[in-house]
Amino acid sequence: MATAVHRNGSLTPVSLRVFVLVGFGGGALTQALLFAVFLVLYVVTVLGNLTMIVVITLDARLHSPMYFFLKNLSFVDLCYSSAIAPNALANFLSTSKVISFEACATQFFFFSLLATTETFLLAVMAYDRFMAICSPLRYPVTMCPTTCTRLVLGTFCVGCLNSIVQTSLTFQLPFCSSNRIDHFYCDVPPLLQLACASTALNELFLFGLCGFIIVSTTLAVLVSYGYITVTILRMHSGSGRHKVFSTCGSHLTAVSLFYGTLFVMYAQPGALTSMEQGKVVSIFYTLVIPMLNPLIYSLRNKDVKDALQRLGQRHSLVKAVRGCPAAGGNASV
């Protein structure tokens, strides 16, 4: 424990201002392999999500509420992984693996903000599908551009509020027992283990707030898809059912992956008993899921695949036009 020695010989705990991210341990070869894995995951994540953002922005046929939310999901995923991956990559190549108190708090703030935002954004996307399938006549009025913008801003506001509460409660604690965070980024469970004061309030808020967020948004998704399922069963057109399944199937896959990993990480106390297990799960929802989401929505969505094809053809046409000589430029006089 870090201490300060007074003139009378008494000792007082001193809160640490620097942390060491232990990560996964191992020798130089292990660190190099982890660096390669993280780098590939992060590069694919960045390219995939940037592609989705560009395609949806440039293709007028994708300017609808569903793709507006999908573009924002790609933006959140891009920022989400960028809050974790660059620092982790730098630590794999470093021997000190030091992160300052302020940098740790900043990383956790954005991580918590973006994770909460994505949780609510997925619920909003489920509501959008519910309105489109179950109330198609009211859909254009209900999900107008103003409403969609407000819903997205609302998810960010809720995420920011939750992040402020979690960050304030966590980083007001005195960290004096050790400065070694048994993780590859700053997260609440390993940080609470370093505190030399009672963490009961923090644990209550951690499991209470995270539990409420996960349960409430999961219920919203389940209710939305419950109504969607009933509507699908009443459809007489096979092509209509197939189209609904193709659009909703992608979202259900993304929801299942994201909510499932969050539930394992935060809603089950037993999952926190093993930090190594927590690290593996953390890789999944900080890097793997943001990497998979663009693939899930592009490979299983005909509109996105067609938009990608049109964008590719447009790019090829522009290159061909630029490569052609000016008319008459090579003609003999």
Swiss-Prot record:
UniProt xrefs under CDD domains: 7tmA_OR9K2-like (cd15419)
Bilayer topology annotation: Multi-pass membrane protein
GO CC term, one of those recorded: membrane
Record's subcellular location: Cell membrane
Source superkingdom: Eukaryota
One Pfam family this sequence matches: 7tm_4
A GO biological-process term: G protein-coupled receptor signaling pathway
Protein's name in the database: Olfactory receptor 9S13
Organism of this sequence: Mus musculus (Mouse)
Gene (name only): Or9s13
